[in-house]
């Protein structure tokens, strides 16, 4: 799983991510919507990035990027977009407080990796990982008072998930 943190922030980051993709062929590339847009613009469109694109535009870009790179793209946001270039799954689970907690994206990357270890279908594994994140986030937010308690409660809720959730 390649997390393209801040890929659009500097030329160095974009060049480094491009080299990693070329040499390692990641199974999953994960980023927030603006990171996926930046990667799309560099890999396919070669134009500037409009970070205010809506979900359907990000969906189109993620799908094209997944097809171009032959991998799964996970674009996180209020609605998570997961695609293999052919199929697109939108994950609506989650809570707005999750976006205010530092390192939540890093946690998502780790969870996707864990799900990939036990499910040989990368699209399915990525969808289940993001649904698990969202469900744990919703449950944690219901009894959190702010960002600090949210992270602690999220970790507890994540540990308490069951297959039937």
Language-model-detected regions and their locations in the chain:
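Short, small-residue alpha-helix embedded
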Residues: 38, 100-131
């Amino acid at each position: 799983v390649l997390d393209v943190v801040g890929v659009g922030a500097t030329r160095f980051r974009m060049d480094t991510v491009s080299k990693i993709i070329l040499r390692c062929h990641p199974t999953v590339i994960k980023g927030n919507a603006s990171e996926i847009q930046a990667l799309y613009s560099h890999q396919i469109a070669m134009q500037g990035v409009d970070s205010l694109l809506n979900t359907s535009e990000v969906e189109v870009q993620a799908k094209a990027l997944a097809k171009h790179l032959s991998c799964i793209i996970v674009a996180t946001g209020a609605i998570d977009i997961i695609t293999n270039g052919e199929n697109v799954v939108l994950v609506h689970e989650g809570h707005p407080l999750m976006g205010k907690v530092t390192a939540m994206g890093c946690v998502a990357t780790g969870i996707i990796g864990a799900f990939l270890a036990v499910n040989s279908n990368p699209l399915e594994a990525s969808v289940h990982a993001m649904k698990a994140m969202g469900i744990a986030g919703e449950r944690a937010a219901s009894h959190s008072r702010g960002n600090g308690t949210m992270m602690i409660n999220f970790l507890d809720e994540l540990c308490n998930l069951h297959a039937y959730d």
